[in-house]
Amino acid sequence: MSTVFALSNISKFFGKNNELPIITNANIKIKKGEIVALIGRSGSGKSTLLHIAGLLDTPSSGNIFINNIECSNKTSDKDKTFLRRHFLGFIYQFHHLLQEFSVLENVMLPQIIIGKSKSIAKKNAMEILERVKLQDKFSMSISQLSGGERQRVAIARSLINCPLIVLADEPTGSLDNNTAFEVFSLLQEYAKEKNIAIFLATHNKSLAQKACRIVEINSCMLSSVD
């Protein structure tokens, strides 16, 4: 299968004089439909790498390739926004759902942002809510949902625009183990059906084993885990 996402020689340094390396020369290619788990101890740079991958943070050096479109630290904010909206999906440990919106409105939002009509956005949102088993709760507020249900809303929102890749930063970290596997299975099933790649940062080693392959950040370096 073709490569839909790649990091090439990505480095990130912090400090006044860039004296603190967080990531050094990270390279990875992710194919269409592939699930790649990213592991590493707390503070190793997993979230930083995913933020760079999602064009939410700028690398000190290196390039990101999304659908063969090159993106560097010189890429304009306008172009980054376009790439995020049309090619990327995001899921976080803390769902970042809009509390004042209903379940349906939260899931519709990415479609509205890219210019879909409300009627089409609503139709697509209801279809994907059915896939994550929340179609009966579309009118509820986020505060009325359980933690697992909120993450299912976050998954639906991340997938509604059929991105090339979903970047998931500890998406099940706040859930109990059974709920975590249930939520991940929903994500995995839909992504497989639509051939969507997933780059998943997790502390859950059992969850990581369900990926196609595992990579690890250790001492600022990214390497494959056999």
Curated annotation (Swiss-Prot):
EC number annotated for this UniProt entry: 7.6.2.-
Classification lineage: Bacteria, Pseudomonadati, Pseudomonadota, Alphaproteobacteria, Rickettsiales
Summary of the function given for this chain in its UniProt record: Part of the ABC transporter complex LolCDE involved in the translocation of mature outer membrane-directed lipoproteins, from the inner membrane to the periplasmic chaperone, LolA. Responsible for the formation of the LolA-lipoprotein complex in an ATP-dependent manner.
Name of this protein: Lipoprotein-releasing system ATP-binding protein LolD
Gene: lolD
Keyword Nucleotide-binding: yes
UniProt subunit comment: The complex is composed of two ATP-binding proteins (LolD) and two transmembrane proteins (LolC and LolE).
Record bears the keyword S-adenosyl-L-methionine: no
GO molecular function, one term: ATP hydrolysis activity
GO CC annotation, single: plasma membrane
InterPro entries: AAA+_ATPase, ABC_transporter-like_ATP-bd, ABC_transporter-like_CS, MacB-like_ATP-bd, P-loop_NTPase
